[in-house]
Amino acid sequence: MSTNLHWQSFGQGPDLVLLHGWGMNGAVWQQTVESLQADFCVHVVDLPGYGFSAEHHGEDLAQIAAMVLKDAPEKAVWLGWSLGGLVATHIALNAPQRVSKLITVASSPKFAAEKPWRGIQPNVLSAFTSQLLEDFSLTIERFMALQAMGSPSARKDVKQLKQAVLSRPQPNPESLLVGLNILADVDLRDALISLTMPMLRLYGRLDGLVPIKVATDLSQQLPHTQQFVFSQSSHAPFMTEHDEFCAQVRDFAQD
């Protein structure tokens, strides 16, 4: 069995790595790749346990990050969506020489709510965990619906996410469980202060998983970082407001 994760590279220019979220795979970036490959060499990986990397498995955030770094470009702009944002942030904190700039999309240094911090209610995460053990494809479908909820194009977004997921092998249930545990337990809030590279945080105003209050709180904690809020988007702004999303990434990653 190969120990290498599934990577694809498109276009030419500065290196840009895209990391997908929980339950998904690299196919979610297809439209983004098509728009950005004229300006960047875009690298897309299926995280351990997902898509064409389904036979691989990382036990925790540190191991997942190490597996991703193994075949990643020497130095790149890293963009992580949702759970992928935690992976990208972990890499930026622990291997800063590999990360020229960091972009997080609909992501949070701590996904679980814990007053006064806003986030996903722990009971929602534990419900997903118990559902996962019974029927993981239904659980992923529910998670997709939750991600798109609130967006004016919710139905279209869910359809697009679903097509992407179904176009590659099903995720490995063990890795799905690890991912939910990461979302429930990881807290990088205090660590963020030590980030050295430029950072852009992108949010959807209507996001039910990463409440917009997270953006405000982090702006105060990280005044040297940039942020942008997509007014019509929920958890997947790269689909809902695709052109504006690509413009934000382009402007930040190129300057």
From Swiss-Prot:
Transmembrane segments: none annotated. The keyword Hydrolase applies. GO terms for cellular component: cytoplasm; membrane. Pathway: Cofactor biosynthesis; biotin biosynthesis. Keywords: Biotin biosynthesis, Cytoplasm, Hydrolase, Serine esterase. Residues 16-241 form the AB hydrolase-1 domain. Its EC number is 3.1.1.85. GO terms for biological process: biotin biosynthetic process. Substrate binds at W22, S82, L83, F143, M144, A145, L146, Q147, H235. It is found in: Cytoplasm. Disulfide bonds: none annotated. PANTHER family: AB HYDROLASE SUPERFAMILY PROTEIN YCLE, MONOACYLGLYCEROL LIPASE. The physiological role of BioH is to remove the methyl group introduced by BioC when the pimeloyl moiety is complete. It allows to synthesize pimeloyl-ACP via the fatty acid synthetic pathway through the hydrolysis of the ester bonds of pimeloyl-ACP esters. This is Pimeloyl-[acyl-carrier protein] methyl ester esterase. It comes from Vibrio parahaemolyticus serotype O3:K6 (strain RIMD 2210633). The gene is bioH.
